[in-house]
Every structure is written in structure tokens, then in C-alpha cells.
Amino acid sequence: MANKTRWIKSRIKSVNETKKITRAMYLISASKMKRSRDRLDSTRPYFEKINEFMKDLVVHGMQTNHILFEGSYKEGQKRLGVIVISGDKGLCGGYNANVIRSTLNLYENLSNKGEVIFFPIGTVGKNFLSRHGYKVEDNFNYQTQSVSVKVAKGIAQNVVKKYYRGDIHELYIIYTKLISTIKQDVVVKKLLPLDPSEFVSGEFKKDETIRYEPSPTNVLDVVIYEYLKGIIFGAMMDSYVSELAARMTAMDNATKSADEMIQKLVLKLNRERQAVITQEISEIISGAAALK
């Protein structure tokens, strides 16, 4: 019984150490999540204004014959690019599994149309796609946790350049949108070619007071690029915040599970101690009876 008591004490100590780690990870994720949401909120007004410019340019008909609206595919095998935003680490519940599941579903749908090329952002997604033999773009090394407008700019330049060259004819993005701390949804969005109907849905009055210099077409090139950069940055930030929220939930659940396990082990330890005491009392009584 003494050995069993020592084992239970060792187990309680081990679970306590694990609980400290999960609690610390919960607090770190909560702190990072708040800072990341503040960053996302601070950049939102700028990208909302870019979206308004896009609407106005489309209403003016400036998208006509523009390659980013009309498409770059002419003939031969079609190539479809997919930006996949996953996490850099695990211990975040089903976050990465949900992204990978949506990625594989999209691959099944797109593979009938042509060759699918992945542009992974995040270590987990990249490792999975490479390990299972999917075509992954070379020299495309980005981490979710290093998200910034500068990084989003580099990604936008990379994929738009490939689109202009005809290396890809369509572009999609898979990311995770934060609904609440305990709920995150995976979103699949088509980025290129752009769909004019996305910008003219609902009521929108074109602003006749705006003058585009040197010309609306030149302005459109810049605005489209800024729009795509904003979409990619927003998707990366949303995904990163969602990953942190998922990790918070997972670590909170792990901490609660550790508490429950410790309670059960303490109860078990007390029972073992009680059994030892009962046995010792029985031995004393038996010894005393033998002496009579």
C-alpha cells in the first residue's frame, strides 16, 4: 500500500505541473488575442475605405477588360492557386484539423478543373500538405504568428504577379473567422478573378464628386492591389486570433480536467491512507488480543 500511496502522490504532482503549464498558456493566449484584435480593429477603417473605392470604380464601369476581373485563362491546363492559412503550433483543439478538412474538400472540387497549387501560411498546414504529396509553392514561407501589413503586402505581390504571368488562373483563400471565443468558422473565398457583383450588391450610389487622377484605370490598379492586400491581412489576423481563441478554450478545458483529476486522485489517496490506518488498527487490536 505504501508503494501505491507514493505513486498517487507522484501522479498528483505531475498533474499539478501540467495544470500550471496549461494555465500559463491560457493566460498568454488571452493576452496575445487582445493585442491582435486591437491591431485588426485599428486597420479596419483603412481597408473599409479601400472597399468603398472599389465599389465606386466598379459602378463607374472601370473594371471592364481588366485582367483581375476578366481572368487570365486562355488555353491549356488550368492552374488554381489556394492560399491556406493554418496555425504554426498545435494545442488549439480542432482549429488546424478544421482548416485541413476544408482544404481537402476544396481540393476535391477544384482538382476536376485543373492543377491545384497550394500557398500555405502556417507551419501545420504546410507540413501536412508537403507530407501528403500535394503541390506546394516553392519558397513560400510565411508564419501566421508573424502577421503584419508588410507580410500581407509581400504575399499579395507574389500571387498577383503569378496571376498576371498566367502561372495561376484562379486564386482562393481558406482562413478561419472568429465568431466568438468558443466558436470559429472556416471560410473559403475566391479572390481572383474578382467578381464585380460583390461590389455592387445592395444600395450604393456612385460619388460623382470624386476625380481619379491620372485616370480611373491607373487608380483601379492600385486600389485592387490594396484591396487584395487588405483581404489577405484581414484573413491572416482573423485566423491568428481564431487560433489563439481555440488555444484559450483548449487550455481552459485542460486546466479544468486537471482540477477534476487532482480531486479524484486526492480522494483516492485519502482512501488509501484510511485503508493503511485501518489495517494498522486491526493489527494492533489483533496483537493485543493475542497477548491476553
UniProtKB/Swiss-Prot annotation:
GO CC terms of this entry: plasma membrane; proton-transporting ATP synthase complex
CDD domains cross-referenced by the UniProt entry: F1-ATPase_gamma
GO process annotations (BP): proton motive force-driven plasma membrane ATP synthesis
Pfam families associated with the record: ATP-synt (PF00231)
Localization terms from the record: Cell membrane
Molecular function terms from GO: ATP binding; proton-transporting ATP synthase activity, rotational mechanism
Membrane topology recorded in Swiss-Prot or TrEMBL: Peripheral membrane protein
Sorted UniProt keywords: ATP synthesis, Cell membrane, CF(1), Hydrogen ion transport, Ion transport, Membrane, Transport
PROSITE patterns reported in the protein's UniProt record: ATPASE_GAMMA
Oligomeric and partner information: F-type ATPases have 2 components, CF(1) - the catalytic core - and CF(0) - the membrane proton channel. CF(1) has five subunits: alpha(3), beta(3), gamma(1), delta(1), epsilon(1). CF(0) has three main subunits: a, b and c.
Cited function: Produces ATP from ADP in the presence of a proton gradient across the membrane. The gamma chain is believed to be important in regulating ATPase activity and the flow of protons through the CF(0) complex.
Family, similarity comment: Belongs to the ATPase gamma chain family.
This protein's name: ATP synthase gamma chain
